[in-house]
Amino acid sequence: MTEALPFWKTKHLTELTREEWESLCDGCGRCCLHKLRDEETEELAFTNVSCRLLDTQSCRCTSYATRFRKVPDCISLTPALVAEIDWLPPSCAYRIVLNGKDLPWWHPLVSGDPETVHQAGISVRGRAIDEREAGPLEDYIVSWPGRFPRPRRPRQEPAGKTADES
């Protein structure tokens, strides 16, 4: 008997259920970092300053259901917006699926573990600064959120050896 392919391999973003759409978010928090755009050149610059609602440890929104009331410029991603905007990180699952690619090994839908996005060094955990603690955004410009990361695989012990024996 053939196993059914996962939804992200068989459906377009516009065909996803609400649950499928929400599960595509890997919880990296990169989209919740402030971005700057040069008014003359339109060049985009990423910062490591996070929205005040982002829990920089879990990399999840602390007020997801009410975020638009608390942060009026928070964006509600839609399939149309994913296709239009240029500031989603290249590692964003919405972008990856839109481009017909498979999700990476560290994505929780592939790994079965929401911690792999952090273990692989994809998330903003340990790298983001809360906007309430930051100074001028121009002082926090970084390039890493705009690059596809080279994820590090979690260390695995050799077969037959336990972590205690290492």
Curated annotation (Swiss-Prot):
- Show the PANTHER family listed in the entry: UPF0260 PROTEIN YCGN
Give the HAMAP family listed for this entry: UPF0260 (MF_00676)
Residues of the region (Disordered) are: 147-166
The name this protein carries in UniProt is UPF0260 protein GbCGDNIH1_2046
Tell me one Pfam family matched here.
Answer: CxxCxxCC
Question: Which residues are connected by disulfide bridges in this protein?
Answer: none
Q: Which NCBIfam families match?
A: PRK05170.1-5, PRK05170.2-5
Q: Where is the composition biased (Basic and acidic residues)?
A: 154-166
The similarity comment for this entry is: Belongs to the UPF0260 family.
